């Protein structure tokens, strides 16, 4: 197989990034935007010894799983990798992704996986689900400001104010901001030169409260003629918070370290279940509130709290899971590295009149081992104990020193919430080699039309 060869391929599998996989005379090709079951014509773009990457040129025979994408930019934009795949098939793909990682990385057998796996929790309406969107700003060839999303693996902006995954209010807000920029000759930020003012716009929406936040990330300290923009934005029903976040760094970090209120208050509120949360521009908050309620409900179900338990919630963010758990537990301790998030968690506990949740700032892999060692010193060698430990780590998973401490504390249950089933499988392998067994495992589709899937696992001490 050589570069620029044109080949006809039947797509027989899906890669972890959503690309179609096919074979030509035993040679494996990865083809972006091809759907399992398609027969396609593809052009080889990169040829290695045993495999290569090809560009989809034409769908010769469409798969039964191929659907018309809702967004005209689906193939070019880097946001939705599998929008041309039917939603039912997306859920099968995500289930297989979790199972594949558990088998390949975790070393679990198919029988073991079949025993514990439950079907992926999907969405009834898998579009318009995001309560948060961050739009980069740039300039077109005519020097007009544009906004949209980055093309896959680039920082080239695909101009689009109407993302199918976001709420309908996003379009109106972005059009108002673009008009304000044109009328007042305000330039978009240029990554290459470091000049220009508007870098990004963050929009948050409360699905239960209908409150809207707009935060403009600016390459400076102020927004010229801000009152003209505010006058238009506050006409949108639900507008609650308009802020700016200064960010003059020459890097890819989106938000600045702080924000200033231009109008309204510095936060919006929303609910997950019956718990109310205060969300600032810098808060971490799950982007799909419909599925988050199911995700946390599953974590609570797996924890099966009776009311007399001590629970640790590691990587607790703004206390989203902690406050859910606190309603059923005797005491909850939350740990999070971001100080602002812990401030939010404490405020959220106060808002909900929850007084049995305590929060600590620090790395989970440092705070828990330090707590364990200190407890042992102060109690004449007696070991610290937790009834349930919940972990919700970033993509890199849990540090091994943290897993060691979890095992030492001998909780009856560990509830592991994961955004990357590969690192989940690695960590489950460690826990299962050290006195635990998986009882239940289930995917929750937080991100329809993308390759990402959350997973919740219950481990029980043997």
What spans do the regions from the language model cover?
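Residue-level signal for inorganic ion chemistry
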Residues: 22, 37, 80, 201, ...
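Carbohydrate-binding surface patches
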Residues: 202-206, 211-222
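Terminal RNA-binding accessory module
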Residues: 1-73, 111, 359, 366
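Short, solvent-exposed loop/turn elements at beta->coil junctions and helix N-caps
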Residues: 118-126, 191-192, 200, 204, ...
